[in-house]
Amino acid sequence: MIAIIDYGMGNIRSVEQALKYIGAAYIVTSDKEEIFRSDGVILPGVGAFPKAMDILEEKDLVRVLQEIGRSRKPLLGICLGMQLLFEKSEELQDCNGLSLLPGVIRKLKVPYKIPHMGWNELKKEGEIALWNGVEDGSFVYYVHSYYADCPNEIVYGISDYGVKVPGFVAKGNIYGAQFHPEKSGDIGMQILKNFKGVVETWKSSQLSI
């Protein structure tokens, strides 16, 4: 069972539809016990970083997500949800994030339209389980005005928008997509299927303990 975190700022409906399409069992929840009982977690998000962190704090979900991230349970952040995984953001004001990944969220300063909205090429950097069946140079769908300034060793996908935008990051059990896999057609569905596979592998490992 995959828990989709419901904190009032997520693109939950489209994530739900995507998981339903790939045959993944899921629950939409903000209940701490349900999140801990899940086999994997998706943190979606649309909106402002500081407001999102305030809501997560109010719901006591900061601690929960940090515990999930520091365990071996698979965690996938999408768009703002990915940004929240980092140490802090410069959006509106300096604001601390979940600090599960090293790096800072900075505003895009490019000679192009902001937000970066629409399809862009994703160049793979290295191989991870979520790249199974995903071709290098596939196009994915973005909507964002901020990007992750983070170490190269956690970047597994890059798109060019005047700067090198980390489109996909990963470290251990933690994954983050700056783009929207749930809106990225067949490629996005394949990435979510791969995440489902990682979740199932983790679940099997727990049953054997």
Curated annotation (Swiss-Prot):
Residues covered by the Glutamine amidotransferase type-1 domain: 1-205
UniProt keyword terms in alphabetical order: Amino-acid biosynthesis, Cytoplasm, Glutamine amidotransferase, Histidine biosynthesis, Hydrolase, Lyase
UniProt main location, coarse: cytoplasm
Subcellular location(s) per record: Cytoplasm
MF-aspect GO terms: glutaminase activity; imidazoleglycerol-phosphate synthase activity; lyase activity
EC number, as in UniProt: 4.3.2.10, 3.5.1.2
Catalytic activity: 5-[(5-phospho-1-deoxy-D-ribulos-1-ylimino)methylamino]-1-(5-phospho-beta-D-ribosyl)imidazole-4-carboxamide + L-glutamine = D-erythro-1-(imidazol-4-yl)glycerol 3-phosphate + 5-amino-1-(5-phospho-beta-D-ribosyl)imidazole-4-carboxamide + L-glutamate + H(+); L-glutamine + H2O = L-glutamate + NH4(+)
Keyword Chloroplast: no
One Gene Ontology cellular component annotation held by this UniProt entry: cytoplasm
Keyword Cytoplasm: yes
Pfam families (alphabetical): GATase
Recorded superkingdom: Bacteria
Annotated catalytic residues: 79, 180, 182
Disulfide partners: none
Pathways involved: Amino-acid biosynthesis; L-histidine biosynthesis; L-histidine from 5-phospho-alpha-D-ribose 1-diphosphate: step 5/9
Biological process according to GO: L-histidine biosynthetic process
Known function: IGPS catalyzes the conversion of PRFAR and glutamine to IGP, AICAR and glutamate. The HisH subunit catalyzes the hydrolysis of glutamine to glutamate and ammonia as part of the synthesis of IGP and AICAR. The resulting ammonia molecule is channeled to the active site of HisF.
Subunit structure: Heterodimer of HisH and HisF.
Protein name: Imidazole glycerol phosphate synthase subunit HisH
